[in-house]
């Protein structure tokens, strides 16, 4: 078995290649207007295929409809699946030299530098790339960059918890009113949630986690699921800190941020595959994503020159109790990630339930 594994690894290495000593990462810098790129994309066929990390099939329907309304005649075929599965499927396409995807947007930030070094990504700077925070992009090749800041917030239903006026810390969740009221994503099933627990427990220790377990939280798969359950009247659970709903997630839902440990934020990262079948369509999509027009609609912009929509703070870099640059380093340290997964799996058991894409929650 070990000999076969060695042969497989050597074969994989022989089929991959490294661009470092090629000294050829200079990007194409876009100078055309959106309208000019739009007409080029229509001439190409008007189709874009995007794989976007997420845990609900319809999670990017708003992006699809907004884009298609903005650019009549364009079809945005967008598939949502867990980033930890999509990256492997992309590797398979690259291995087989059979790329069918134009654009990828994923949470697995550790993949992008590797793909860039393998020569799998298009070195291309959309208009607005120069405005993106340096920490959120490959400044040399322009092959990848964040397009929106994702983050976990504290969220609760004010109708279900009428006596809770504010939640200002993770320690608050150990109070009696939250007994049987919490719904949380398994940390051993999502690396961004894993990082949330890691950051919290670096400050509050395992004593906090022991106390949290005594509150009998409901553990679920997927990060959209907790907010869905919190929002729905037919579930008793009424608070979470492992979901992303922006600053105004819905009626009767209040959002707050902790003061006793950092919350997780990161730039959800995008790239165009070098052998994308619809390169002009992909360029249109990425220029739109980094445009001021689109960036003004997201909760927290990746651009330095745009104030965040709905945030009490001017930008992500001046938001207290978070550091959007550290998640990428965490994701690169797969040894630590695996050790933490097993720690939580030992305490909680393996993640139970159907994939969040098909569980109808």
Stretches with model-predicted labels:
Residues 110-114, 234-256:
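A ligand-binding cleft/hinge motif common to bilobed small-molecule-binding domains
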Residues 63, 208, 268, 277-289, ...:
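Short amphipathic alpha-helical coupling segments at ligand-binding clamshell hinges
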Residues 153-160, 266-278, 297-301:
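A bilobed periplasmic-binding-protein/Venus flytrap-type ligand-binding module shared by bacterial periplasmic
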Residues 1-18:
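Fungal secretory targeting signals
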Residues 288, 292-361:
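Extracellular/periplasmic juxtamembrane helices and adjacent flexible linkers that interface
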Residues 133-136, 149-151, 209-213, 219-220, ...:
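Periplasmic-binding protein-like
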Residues 17-34, 44-62:
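Extracytoplasmic "Venus flytrap"
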């Amino acid at each position: 078995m070990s000999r076969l594994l060695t042969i497989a690894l050597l074969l994989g290495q022989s089929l991959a290649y490294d661009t470092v000593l090629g000294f050829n990462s200079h990007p194409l810098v876009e100078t055309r207007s959106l309208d000019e790129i739009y007409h080029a994309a229509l001439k190409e066929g008007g189709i874009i295929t995007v794989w976007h990390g997420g845990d609900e099939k319809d999670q990017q329907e708003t992006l699809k409809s907004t884009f298609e309304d903005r650019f009549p005649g364009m079809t945005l075929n967008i598939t949502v699946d867990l980033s930890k599965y999509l990256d492997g499927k992309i590797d398979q396409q690259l291995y087989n030299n059979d790329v069918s995807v134009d654009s990828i947007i994923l949470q697995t930030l550790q993949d992008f530098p590797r793909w860039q070094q393998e020569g799998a990504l298009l070195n291309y700077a959309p208009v607005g790339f120069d405005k993106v925070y340096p920490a959120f992009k490959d400044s040399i090749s322009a092959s990848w960059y964040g397009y929106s800041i994702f983050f976990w917030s504290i969220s609760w239903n004010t109708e279900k918890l009428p006596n809770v006026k504010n939640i200002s810390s993770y320690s608050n969740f150990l109070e009696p009113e939250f007994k049987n009221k919490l719904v949380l994503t398994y940390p051993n099933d999502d690396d961004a949630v894993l990082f949330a627990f890691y950051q919290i427990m670096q400050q509050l220790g395992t004593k906090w986690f022991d106390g949290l377990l005594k509150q009998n939280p409901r553990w679920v798969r997927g990060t959209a699921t907790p907010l869905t359950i919190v929002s729905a009247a037919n579930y008793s659970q009424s608070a979470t800190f492992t979901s992303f709903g922006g600053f105004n997630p819905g009626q009767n839902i209040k959002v707050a941020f902790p003061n006793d440990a950092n919350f997780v934020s990161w730039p959800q990262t995008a790239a165009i595959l070098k052998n994308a079948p619809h390169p002009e369509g992909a360029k249109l999509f990425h220029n739109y994503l980094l445009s001021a027009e689109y960036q003004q609609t997201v909760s927290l912009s990746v651009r330095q020159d745009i104030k965040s929509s709905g945030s009490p703070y001017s930008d992500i870099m001046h938001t207290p109790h978070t550091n959007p640059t550290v998640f990428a380093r965490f994701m690169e340290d797969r040894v630590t990630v695996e050790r933490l997964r097993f720690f939580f799996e030992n305490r909680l058991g393996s993640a139970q339930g159907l994939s969040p894409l098909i569980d109808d929650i």
